[in-house]
A protein has these predicted regions:
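Non-catalytic interaction/Regulatory regions outside core domains
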Residues: 1-134
Length: 134
């Protein structure tokens, strides 16, 4: 009998969270949870979606987003806590939301045609789910 370590259990929980979040909308291309160093804790790509990033590009993107998130947190005393960040690109829209602790970040990509209101609605649902899960 093989016992699971707490790390294995946490990884499985993160994978389940990603799948649950991916199921919120057919316009979500990818959901990932990354740590404060940009390392992927779990991620799920919508079925049939071709990734736009190469593996190395994804690693770099997640590192950049984790770094940006860390830097933004230094201003929370002045401007308040981060609710989410939104980046509109030619091919996708990227949404990031801080996790329940400073050590995680939720990373979403959306199909290009997704409206701001749709993304905002999903962001509100995700914020509630993050609170409920912790």
């Amino acid at each position: 009998m093989v016992s699971q370590t707490s790390s294995d259990i946490e990884t499985q929980k993160n994978k389940e969270k990603c799948q649950k979040l991916l199921n919120l909308s057919s316009k979500i291309r990818y959901v990932g949870i990354i740590n404060e160093f940009g390392r992927t804790l779990a991620g799920q790509l919508r079925r049939g979606v071709i990734p736009l990033f190469k593996v190395e590009e994804a690693r770099n993107e997640f590192f950049i987003e984790a770094t940006r998130n860390h830097l933004r947190r230094t201003f929370e005393d002045s401007i308040g806590k981060i609710e989410f960040t939104l980046t509109a690109n030619e091919k996708v829209t990227i949404l990031t939301l801080p996790g329940a602790t400073a050590s995680s970040l939720y990373y979403f990509t959306f199909d290009k045609g997704t409206t701001f209101n749709e993304v905002l609605g999903i962001a509100e649902v995700v914020k509630r789910l993050i609170i409920e899960d912790n």
